[in-house]
Amino acid sequence: MVLKSLLGIASLFLALNFDAVVHAEANGAIPSIGGRYFHGRVEIPVPAFAQDDPRWSDVRLGPSTDTLGDEGCAVTSAAMVAAFYGIKTDPQQLNAFLTRTGGFTGDGLIHWSRVPSIAPAHLELAYNGGPSYELIDSNLLAGNPVIALIPLPDGGYHFVVIVGKEGRDYLIRDPAASPFRRAYHLRDLTDRIAGLCFFRAI
């Protein structure tokens, strides 16, 4: 998925106001390598989903004219995290649920606060905002994966799931990669982190 504009990114982080997201991207993005040093490789066993899986790649993303295969990185990342917490879902099922329950804007941008409503007794939105090594590292040590908003070299944006760390290198599950690919270094995809979103089990 490539998100084309900062306006689109601001809208994707709907728990924040637009100015806050613009400020975070302009002034608060952090390098993709950093934070606390992890000895060895720490990796949370997050299930892998791919947005271009033929089972759902052609499914329409929410009420938009886009498809999960083209623009479904946020929904696919959320589905990976929800499945990790034991919720029986996948990108197609989560997309259908959010479409039915007002979980998207008209352009197919996700309301992160609506994601836990698929299992309200089990999951809650804990954070949706700017990047922080402390937030990422403390969640990884607690066994919680973190969804990250990242800028891409071509000027687009993408969502991935941070699932671990090796030294100061973050490990990700990438919804645009094959589900059979091992978690790989975030630095191989981007040099910055622009935003974070994570959930917690209740």
Regions found by a protein language model. Give the residues of each.
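Conserved active-site-adjacent core of cysteine acyl-enzyme catalytic domains
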Residues: 15, 19-25, 45, 79-202
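Active-site-adjacent structural segments surrounding the nucleophilic cysteine of cysteine proteases
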Residues: 2-103
